[in-house]
Amino acid sequence: HLYHRRQRQMCIRDRGEQRGQSEAIARNLAVMSELKTPIIVVVTGEGGSGGALAISIGDHLSMLEYATYSVASPEACASIIWRTPDKAPEAANAMKVCSSELKKINVIDEVISEPVGGAHRDFDIVSANIKASLVNNLTILSKYSMDDLLERRYKRLIDIGA
């Protein structure tokens, strides 16, 4: 049973490689790092795996209060470290996937508040909060020269995890 699960995980990774996902993510990061426009990223639900890495290049990274963001799922991390996805809660805790934790360690810049229970409880409030964040941060970022924005973006990318 364990052998088949590992084989299935290996096949999923191999299929991803066959489709060129890692190369596509790398190309995305290279292109986004040179875009001459402010980039604001808002994680509204689950930002995970290669998709999380692909959007990490923004000039400002915000997350909704109850969103999660990581380059691997807690199940994948637990499978790698403890060889069982059953340890996903421990992995999630160690990975710091929640917005408040990621803000503390400077992976993200801002936590956008949500109603108790999540964004689906009041779309109007959450939409207004996201709009306010976007307007505020676009105003701030538009004061930088393009050279300064590109320099800050590059520094942000190389400082992740440092």
Residue ranges of each PLM-predicted region?
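Single conserved hydrophobic/aromatic residue that forms the stacking wall/gate
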Residues: 1-12
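Hydrophobic alpha-helical segments that mediate membrane insertion or helix-helix packing
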Residues: 6, 54-55, 102
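Short, well-ordered alpha-helix to beta-strand connector turns
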Residues: 8, 58-59, 99, 108
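Thiamine diphosphate
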Residues: 13-38, 44-52, 56-59
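CoA-thioester-processing core
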Residues: 28, 50-52, 56, 63-83
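Well-ordered beta-strand positions
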Residues: 38-41, 59-63, 79, 110-113
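Hydrophobic alpha-helical bundle architecture
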Residues: 42-46, 64, 87-93
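Amphipathic alpha-helical segments at domain termini/boundaries
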Residues: 72-162
